[in-house]
Every structure is written in C-alpha cells, then in structure tokens.
C-alpha cells in the first residue's frame, strides 16, 4: 500500500490505522498489505513492523495480545519511572527499550526526513514514546 503524504490528513490516518490493525498479523500478511520489504523486529515479546512508503519511514507497534504473557506483564508494570522529560509507565518503557536498538538502526539506514509511528493498545503507548 502506498499513499502516505507528509501532511496531517484523513488518508494518512486511515493508512496508519490499518497498519495498527495489520500489525497483529504475521510478516507475510503485513508485507502483502504494505511493503514486500517490510521487516519485523520481535524481541522478548515486543513486536514492531518497519516499512517505507515513498519518502516516509513507517513504524507500527503490535499491541497487547491477551494470550502473550510478555504483553500482559508489560501492561501490569504500572509503576512510573523517571525519564528526561517527566515520568513514564515502566512496562511501556521496558517494552520499547527491548526493540528500540533495532528500530533506531533501521530508521538511520533509511535516511528519511519523515517518520510516522502508529500502534494500538500497548502498541499505541510504544508509538507515543518512540515519537
């Protein structure tokens, strides 16, 4: 799927919402829907898809899967921990840290001026922190 633009608009919102939904599927399904060269990083139960849509690098975090203990554990680590700009939910911080090295290396290699982040549930929290 191609069609993202650099502006904030309904088309972009729809595409990124679809990516949030498709992030619950396997890599083959994600590649078929968005980009045959999309990659999946799956580290200690945190999953994130990265792909390109023209001049825009895109990152979609998978949300909580109720059958996955690692997701439930991340959601339940509710104690706040200090970060440079305030406080953050410990489970969300830990889950993002699990995949961030892979995501940041992938983003650096893309050399894109624009990056879009998305996710649902736990994935939405990770997308917010990543942005």
Regions found by a protein language model. Give the residues of each.
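Charged, compositionally biased non-catalytic regions
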Residues: 1-31
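A conserved cap/lid and substrate-binding interface adjacent to the catalytic center
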Residues: 22-118, 129
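Active-site loop->helix "elbow" adjoining a glycine-rich segment at hydrolase catalytic centers
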Residues: 121-126
């Amino acid at each position: 799927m191609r069609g993202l633009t650099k502006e904030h608009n309904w088309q972009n919102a729809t595409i990124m919402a679809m990516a949030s939904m498709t992030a619950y599927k396997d890599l083959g399904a994600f590649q078929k829907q968005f980009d045959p060269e999309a990659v999946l990083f799956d580290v200690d139960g945190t999953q994130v898809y990265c792909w390109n849509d023209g001049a825009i690098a895109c990152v979609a975090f998978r949300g909580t899967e109720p059958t996955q203990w690692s997701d439930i554990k991340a959601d339940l680590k509710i104690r706040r921990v200090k970060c440079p700009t305030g406080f953050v939910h410990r489970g969300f911080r830990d889950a993002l840290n699990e995949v961030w090295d892979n995501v940041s290396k992938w983003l650096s290699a893309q050399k894109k001026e624009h990056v879009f982040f998305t996710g649902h549930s736990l994935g939405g929290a990770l997308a917010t922190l990543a942005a």
